[in-house]
Design a protein with these regions (language model features):
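Extracytoplasmic "Venus flytrap"/periplasmic binding protein-like
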Residues: 71-143, 150-157, 172, 176-182, ...
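Glycine-centered hinge/linker elements that transmit conformational signals in sensory
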Residues: 194-202, 239-271, 315
Length: 448
């Protein structure tokens, strides 16, 4: 699901070849109507000569959207007499770079991921005057944003969405396994046990499921956290202290997962990262996997026969319901910036409907909507195979649920405690021991 590139791009881009196609077309479409807006903003430079802004964010999987963001930033800068630079880092390098900038300076605007607003709360400018109007005029925040975008009563970043995954599957192989409505994923509503049963038949036919359970930031927690919640367990209760992980229903759910892993999955997945399942799916090795729409976009470019045979379903549900692990991404301003007024002016402009809408639509559903207005946006109806992604925000929970997505939740995530609980269970075969281990690890973090 995730695209872990090495190094940063500044001035020129380095992208996977299969995503370069169509960039020009998207760029032209996204630019339509932008110039008049810029001319309105350019009546006179708003800031003193020599003002500079540096923006840091994670690299984009959808390359044309990254190109568009750079153009938007540069044109606003030219219209307002501000020199803007944009850096895009591979995802694992983003947080360390932000930490360095907090200490020594260097960036004005940074992209924050889940829990980072808590981590750097003393170093961020309150931007409620930008975020709240954006949310209100667009129908309010989606659930996952509402749960996480504030630290107490402070708004320390402006939410712009989240990229997430669903269950990609091969239509023909699900048909062979007897799955009803296999040709239309939007009509399929499965429990985990039903999903495992289909996988068992697919594996018997030589087409196992695939799931990454290694130390990787996207796909492993993207399945393990929702599965945990769907069987009634949580890291902590609402008080943010009481461990709620070792529950009988979850232990039983883990037993079902162990059985499903053996019956339905490629068992080498315990060592897979976010890229292994992409390759396995695109090579025809597996019939279904949790992944972002990146697999589908890649297939449309390089493997059209696989794209034609691919659809998506919502993540399965358990006895406690259906859940998605979603964390809010925000654009934040560092307090040590020497150009806070310019940074706020840029964000206020970028989050206007025209600029934000063009950027969000250019990703064709890869980025989930942060506000409710975009639930009915035409982009969701261009390709029926993307329909399940539109529904995900209503099921979103954050890391650390039912407590806040704070530093402790981020630490538990970074240590892969929930993911390793699943890996230990399928490797050792003892659900109870694995869950007890996970609960003990969580106590060490939340008990501090």
């Amino acid at each position: 699901m995730k695209d872990h590139r090495k190094g940063k791009t500044k001035g020129k881009l380095s992208r996977r070849d299969f995503l370069k196609a169509g960039a020009a077309g998207l760029g032209v479409a996204a630019m339509g109507g932008l110039l008049p807006d810029m001319l309105l903003a350019a009546k006179a430079p708003a800031f003193k000569k020599g003002t500079k802004l540096s923006i840091l964010q994670g690299s984009y999987f959808i390359a044309p959207s990254q190109d568009l963001y750079k153009r938007q930033a540069q044109e606003w800068g030219e219209a307002n007499g501000v020199e803007i630079s944009c850096d895009f880092l591979n995802w694992p390098d983003l947080q360390p770079k932000i930490a360095a900038s907090v200490q020594a300076g260097g960036y004005d605007i940074v992209e924050l991921w889940g829990g980072w607003n808590y981590l750097y709360q003393d170093n961020l400018v309150d931007v409620a005057d930008i975020a709240e109007p954006f949310g209100k005029r667009n129908g309010g925040w989606e659930r996952y944003v509402e749960l996480s975008y504030k630290v107490g009563n402070r708004c320390l970043g402006v939410p712009h969405g989240y990229s997430n995954g669903s269950m990609a599957y091969r239509i023909s192989w699900f048909k062979e396994a007897g799955c009803p409505n296999a040709e239309d994923g939007s009509k399929i509503d499965l429990t985990w046990e039903e999903y495992f049963a289909i996988g068992k038949k697919c594996k018997a036919n030589g087409h196992p499921f695939g799931q990454a359970l290694g130390h990787s930031t996207g796909d492993p927690p993207g399945v393990c956290y929702p599965y945990m919640w769907s069987y009634g367990a949580m890291e902590v209760e609402k008080d943010g202290k009481t461990i709620a992980f070792n529950k009988p229903q979850f232990v039983e759910g883990m037993r079902k997962f162990i059985e499903g892993w053996k019956d339905a999955y490629d068992e080498t997945g315990t060592s897979w990262d976010d890229s292994n399942n992409n390759r396995a799916y695109l090579s025809g090795q597996i019939s279904s996997t949790y992944n972002g729409s990146s697999i589908y976009f890649a297939a449309k470019k390089d493997k059209p026969e696989i794209a034609a045979d691919t659809h998506h379903i919502l993540i399965p549900k358990g006895p406690a319901g259906r859940f998605y692990w979603l964390d809010t991404r925000t654009f934040a301003i560092l307090k040590n910036s020497k150009n806070v007024p310019a940074a706020k002016a840029f964000l206020k402009w970028w989050f206007e409907d025209k600029q934000f809408g063009d950027w969000w639509r250019s990703q064709e559903g890869y980025m989930l909507q942060p506000v409710k207005k975009y639930y009915t946006d035409p982009v969701w109806f261009k390709d029926p195979k993307m329909a399940p992604f539109r529904e995900q925000p209503k099921y979103g929970q954050n890391m650390g649920f039912a407590g806040p997505p704070n530093q402790k939740a981020a630490l538990a995530w970074s240590k892969y405690i929930v993911v390793d609980t699943f890996a230990k269970a399928v490797q050792g075969g003892d659900a109870k021991a694995a869950v007890e281990w996970g609960a003990e690890q969580l106590k060490r973090i939340y008990g501090r």
